[in-house]
Curated annotation (Swiss-Prot):
Protein name: N-methyltransferase verN
Key words, A-Z: Methyltransferase, S-adenosyl-L-methionine, Transferase
Induction: Expression is regulated by the cluster-specific regulator verZ.
The protein's role, per its UniProt record: N-methyltransferase; part of the gene cluster that mediates the biosynthesis of 11'-deoxyverticillin A, one of the dimeric epipolythiodioxopiperazines (ETPs) from the verticillin family that act as mycotoxins. 11'-deoxyverticillin A is required for normal conidiation. The nonribosomal peptide synthetase verP is speculated to be responsible for condensation of amino acids to form the carbon skeleton of verticillin, whereas the cluster-specific tailoring enzymes are involved in further modifications leading to the production of 11'-deoxyverticillin A.
Pfam family, one: Methyltransf_23
Organism from which the protein derives: Clonostachys rogersoniana
Top EC group: transferase
GO molecular function annotations of the record: methyltransferase activity
Amino acid sequence: MTEHTVSHANGSDLENAKKTYMLANNQKEIERMKNQHEWIKGSFGGLVKAPIDFDKKNQSILDSATADGTWLMDVRSLFPPETELIGFDIAPELYPPEGTRPRNVELVTADLLQGLPAQWIGRFDLVHQRFVFPNFETEVIREVLGRLMQCVKPGGWIQLVEPCAGENVSGPEPKWFLLLHKLANQFMRSAVPRDAILAILHEEGFVNINIESLDIVIGKHQRNKEMDARGRRSMRDSVSNMYPMITAEQLGMPKEEARAVLDKFEADMQKYRTAVRHVIIWAQRPE
């Protein structure tokens, strides 16, 4: 299998980007992402919504912002062993050691903001990405999504998984849980990237555009106890990651209350019906 790499004229660009990479490169972060993976997979009932042929041999799949490669390693079991699976991320520190990876899985370093390898253009039957676009403003989403769409071969599919973290689907009562949306709107450049994604897909001529929207219930009213445990952990992690970066004044509450936010957040999940909306969007490049 051909080894793909991306080089830059100024090597410091990639190093600077790594320094600003949002994810902590350690085992705790890998465990957080694996829990999130299982939560989204279990909630939506699977990994792939695009109607790709799971039995066809010699297909190529690209996973953008692959992190530790969890999605790619999991989806591998759905396809024949001849399937080519490539994942890329800006920082390779989370990648499993090369000797532990299946032969048809390749993890490389590339930067969505700097451009992708020319040999990827029109190459992939499925291009997948999740939990990336909230970090970008609409114009950057347009630029990045354009690069990913170029990687889809004629007749192939792109699939995007994103939260709608800025939308309240829990009602007004769980005021501490609603802090999640306040933090999202404070820190995310696009707390609800759904509409921008759909508009860009339409504008660029992709067809068979579909969206599955799911309000994933968390806490007391989630009947599936495993999904409840995974969802609560994922929400706690999200709030814990954002909370230290904002002051009590920005939250509009006394410091004493701010110190107890995480406990009250947990209590709201146990008392009220709380949920977070996520979407999966998939679309096809015309033949």
